[in-house]
């Protein structure tokens, strides 16, 4: 049978006809719906989003709250606006509609976690900042601390860089010269579990308690702030399966440019000639050496990170559950550095009886950190004249005159031969029973358990390294076990009297006990290097260990009072007893009080769209810190030692006094005053918070002044409570909703200013700390900030001998050397001319995040930075010193080589007779920076695309972390440690990431 074929011309005509008729048919099926959107008071709502459900068809209301939209007569309108509940209205052919939006109480009364309870944000009288999972979900990092960096005012976070290492967190400045880390509380259990052990996908929210009115409930551990972490829980409804996968690439940023082999040989010749030594005759023509080896390029690599999480949650009216498992695998940007982590989270609650509810949380993680013996400093200093390996396959290294060929060991070989592994296992759990006596009275009892295990295993084989061989194989192992038990019992009372007076009360007790067991050993001389068992070691090099314990017993109470939601009062008190102190100073009391006035609730307050809510706050409280106190600091301590004693002059074991007893040692205390206000403007489109604080640490632990006749020196480890530190500053946060509707745009801004000063050290003599090349870099002294840099002030370079002769006596100085200022005008450059040369503490922390959304697309751009701080670039001591056989950065190509050639980079001279590399402002650099911290572009697929696959939600994201940095700092990255010293730090990485999220 012959098939009929339609002529092409007729086919084209039919297609055109259908194309013309189809829009007409669609238009015939649509109607124009007009209407107005109002709130419950009858006021029109301007800028509300009006969308046809299931489509991208929509508009926004005008200045009179009116709208007009062409849509299906049987469609559904979805009307939404910030601060109001979203309304769905079925059109049913109607052409005129009036939509009334009701206030969203959940949005207006966000609940924050404050310790032993929760509180509506509108009822807060203290300084609390919060972020949710939505604020961190797109950060392509392995550490929760990295994800929250810059997003909370008053909180400084410094990334360690190395995979698996914890960030450093400081809240409202450095409150002590000792440990000033905040207390971390996970699901109600205080813990020293690092944030790197948590899976970010399991975190529901994070609340930071900053002022004493909210931290005093934790008494002797609240002085440095409290970080409250709440993990996810199930909600009522059918089970939900969530799957997320993230794949990332990482590389180092701003790697210093180093000299090649030819450039180094030329520099070496200059160093030799200028110091009166003979240059290497083999380098008479440096250009013949070519480029040589770039050791930093050999050490660094492109890192890869994979992060996967699967969770399942759900529940009914009587029980809820959430369970998840996570796996992270990260190869660092430094060769041989690897990190792997498994996590498990299980949260559940059950209303077993009308008056009895049980809930539990389990957080488990197992991680492994591996690395060889990498050394960033050696890679910067190693000479480019050597290959990575010799022709026979052995590792190369310096061989010969060390003044020419150097003494820095091959920096790549140890990363492959030496082995270092740390295994950690963390188990944090709690079980809570909640008894409800009446609607207004409850009792909670929580048992918490926190177990941590760390196992370190280092193996170093013998090898004929040049210039110094490793002659003995060694293996070091250590086991560290920590167990903490917690039992909290407290009553919760919440009742409103006469419809105006609301009273909340929490009162109870807490008991905590910790034990720690540590053991380590090292054996040398292994018969077989490939058999690493300790039994294979022939020589016991060292063995040691200890067991310690501490306990804390506490009684605490908090009362909240509210009169008509206008006048608010919060008062807390906690009494702690710690085993770490002597009997007469074992107990401490920590009170606080704060008040707030919600002016916007007053009858006379204008009811308009400009100011929706205004609350003024003030508070004062005293908190404590025992973080810097050892478990037995109040007791005298002794060490065992061996001394020749007796007629036979044989060695006898004896006890040697190490520290004096101090039964009067007690807590460091922090008294803090806080005032602030919160404002909501323009129908909650603008929300602004401001806080000003004065934070004074007293009874800070400092070295005790002890008469030398006691047999102890003033520099021993005996401490007393006599120091004082002051921090004062302001915090601001601003959230704006700039656009709503089809195109959405929100902005978050934070800014923090802090000024730090030591008020008393119990000594007129400064403390000098942080020694580099046998010289102290950092000073602690009265009336200066903590950790200021202390050294000489430079004044250019001597251009000729006449300038040397007319300057103050400066031993070793010649033309081309650095000129140092004679600050005391005594005609001699010596230690008396040292002064404060820099402050590592930033004055300002700031950030800005912009989020835009359009038809399923979301774009987030996050900026973060600090200002007002200095960095001591200790790497440049060796890498621009031009005083030894180390490689240098290309900055030295602009060195002084004759009168007028440079006034900043000195001459190259071996041995450094003028001490050009002494601690001075030559190595102090501006640490301020503005970083494009994160850019994320994501797309949420339309639901109609996913229905057939039974996928509820699917999201694709592309992200880049640490995109670009504007800074004047010359090192790898301006984000160095809290002390501001940059020396051999693991580089901060730039991360490119692809993420997929599915919900079923």
Residue ranges of each PLM-predicted region?
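Short, small/polar-rich motifs associated with maturation and membrane association
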Residues: 2-345, 350-352, 357-365, 398, ...
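Extracellular/periplasmic, surface-exposed regions of secreted and cell-surface proteins
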Residues: 136, 181, 275, 303-306, ...
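C-terminal extracellular loops and terminal segments
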Residues: 145-149, 719-726, 767-789, 836-848, ...
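Extracytoplasmic gating/loop element in the C-terminal half of outer-membrane beta-barrel translocons
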Residues: 284, 467, 539, 578, ...
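Glycine-rich, aromatic-lined ligand/substrate-binding cores of catalytic
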Residues: 840-872
């Amino acid at each position: 049978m012959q098939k009929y074929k339609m002529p092409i011309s007729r086919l084209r005509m039919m297609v055109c006809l259908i194309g013309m008729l189809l829009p007409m048919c669609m238009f015939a099926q649509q109607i124009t719906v007009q209407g107005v959107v109002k709130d419950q008071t009858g006021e029109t709502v301007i800028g509300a989003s009006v969308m046809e459900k299931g489509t991208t068809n929509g508009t926004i209301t005008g200045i009179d709250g009116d709208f007009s939209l062409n849509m299906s007569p049987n469609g559904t309108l979805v009307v939404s606006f910030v601060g109001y509940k979203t309304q769905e209205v079925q059109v049913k052919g109607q052409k005129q509609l009036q939509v009334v939006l009701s206030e969203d109480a959940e949005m207006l009364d966000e609940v924050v976690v404050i310790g032993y309870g929760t509180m509506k944000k509108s009822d807060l009288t203290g300084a609390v900042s919060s972020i949710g999972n939505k604020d961190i979900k797109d950060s392509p990092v392995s550490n929760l601390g990295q994800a929250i960096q810059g997003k909370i005012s008053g909180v400084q976070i410094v990334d360690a860089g190395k995979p698996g290492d914890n960030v450093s967190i400081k809240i409202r400045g450095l409150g002590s010269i000792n440990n000033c880390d905040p207390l971390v509380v996970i699901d109600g259990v205080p813990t020293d579990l690092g944030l790197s052990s948590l899976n970010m996908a399991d975190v529901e929210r994070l609340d930071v308690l900053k002022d004493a009115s909210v931290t005093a409930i934790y008494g002797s551990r609240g002085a440095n702030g409290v970080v409250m972490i709440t993990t996810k829980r199930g909600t009522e409804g059918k089970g939900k399966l969530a799957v997320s996968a993230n794949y990332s690439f990482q590389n180092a940023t701003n790697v210093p440019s180093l000299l090649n082999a030819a450039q180094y040989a030329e520099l070496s010749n200059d160093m030799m000639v200028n110091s009166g030594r003979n240059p290497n005759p083999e380098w008479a023509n440096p250009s013949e050496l070519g480029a040589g080896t770039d050791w930093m390029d050999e050490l660094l690599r492109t890192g890869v990170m994979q992060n996967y999480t699967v969770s399942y949650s759900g529940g009914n009216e009587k029980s809820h559950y959430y369970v998840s498992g996570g796996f992270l695998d990260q190869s660092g940007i430094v060769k041989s550095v690897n990190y792997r982590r498994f996590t498990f989270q299980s949260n559940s609650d059950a209303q077993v009886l009308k008056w009895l509810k049980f809930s539990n949380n389990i957080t488990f993680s197992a991680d492994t950190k591996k690395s060889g013996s990498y050394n960033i400093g050696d890679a910067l200093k190693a000479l480019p004249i050597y290959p990575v390996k010799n022709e026979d396959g052995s590792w190369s290294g310096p061989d010969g005159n060390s003044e020419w060929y150097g003494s820095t060991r091959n920096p790549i070989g140890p990363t492959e031969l030496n082995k270092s592994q740390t295994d950690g296992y963390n188990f944090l759990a709690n079980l809570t029973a909640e008894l409800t006596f009446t609607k207004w009275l409850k009792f909670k009892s929580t048992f918490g358990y926190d177990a941590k295990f760390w196992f370190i295993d280092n193996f170093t084989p013998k090898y004929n390294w040049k210039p110094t061989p490793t002659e003995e194989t060694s293996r070091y192992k250590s086991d560290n076990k920590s167990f903490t038990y917690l039992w909290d019992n407290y009553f919760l009372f919440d009742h409103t009297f006469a419809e105006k007076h609301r009273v909340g009360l929490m009162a109870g007790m807490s008991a905590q006990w910790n034990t720690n067991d540590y053991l380590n050993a090292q054996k040398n001389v292994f018969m077989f290097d490939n058999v690493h068992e300790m039994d294979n070691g022939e020589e016991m090099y060292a063995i040691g260990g200890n067991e310690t314990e501490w306990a804390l017993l506490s009684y605490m109470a908090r009362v909240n009072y509210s009169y008509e939601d206008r006048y608010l009062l919060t008062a807390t008190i906690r009494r702690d007893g710690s085993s770490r102190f002597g009997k007469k100073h074992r107990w401490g009391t920590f009170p606080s009080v704060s008040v707030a006035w919600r002016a916007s609730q007053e009858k006379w307050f204008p009811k308009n769209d400009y100011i929706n809510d205004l609350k003024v706050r003030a508070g004062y409280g005293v908190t404590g810190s025992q973080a810097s106190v050892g478990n037995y600091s109040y007791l005298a301590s002794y060490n065992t030692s061996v001394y020749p004693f007796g007629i036979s002059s044989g060695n006898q074991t004896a006890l040697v006094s190490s520290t004096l007893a101090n039964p009067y040692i007690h807590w460091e205390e922090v008294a803090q005053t806080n005032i602030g206000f919160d404002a909501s403007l323009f129908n909650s489109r603008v929300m602004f918070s401001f806080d000003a604080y004065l934070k004074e640490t007293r009874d800070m632990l400092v070295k005790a002044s002890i008469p030398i006749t006691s047999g102890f020196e003033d520099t021993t480890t005996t401490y007393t409570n006599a120091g004082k530190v002051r921090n004062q500053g302001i915090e601001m946060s601003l959230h704006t909703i700039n656009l709503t509707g089809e195109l959405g745009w929100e902005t978050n801004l934070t800014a923090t200013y802090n000024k730090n000063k030591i008020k008393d050290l119990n000594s007129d003599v400064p403390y000098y700390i942080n020694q580099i090349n046998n010289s102290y870099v950092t000073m602690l002294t009265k009336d200066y900030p903590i950790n200021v840099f202390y050294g000489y002030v430079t004044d250019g370079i001597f251009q000729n001998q006449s300038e040397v002769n007319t300057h103050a006596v400066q031993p070793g100085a010649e033309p081309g050397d650095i000129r140092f200022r004679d600050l005391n005008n005594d005609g001699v450059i010596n230690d008396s001319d040292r002064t404060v040369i820099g402050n590592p503490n930033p004055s300002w922390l700031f950030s800005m995040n912009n989020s835009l959304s359009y038809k399923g697309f979301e774009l987030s751009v996050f900026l973060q930075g600090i200002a007002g701080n200095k960095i001591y670039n200790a790497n440049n001591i060796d890498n621009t010193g031009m005083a030894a056989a180390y490689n240098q950065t290309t900055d030295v190509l602009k060195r002084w080589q004759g009168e007028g050639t440079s006034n900043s980079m000195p001459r190259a001279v071996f041995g450094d007779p003028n001490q050009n590399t002494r601690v001075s402002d030559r190595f102090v650099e501006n640490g301020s920076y503005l970083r494009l911290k994160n850019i994320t572009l994501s797309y949420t697929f339309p639901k109609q695309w996913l229905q057939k696959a039974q996928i509820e939600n699917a999201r694709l994201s592309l992200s880049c972390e640490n995109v670009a940095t504007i800074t004047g700092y010359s090192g790898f990255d301006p984000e160095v440690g809290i002390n501001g010293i940059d020396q051999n730090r693991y580089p901060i990485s730039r991360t490119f990431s692809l993420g997929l999220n599915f919900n079923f």
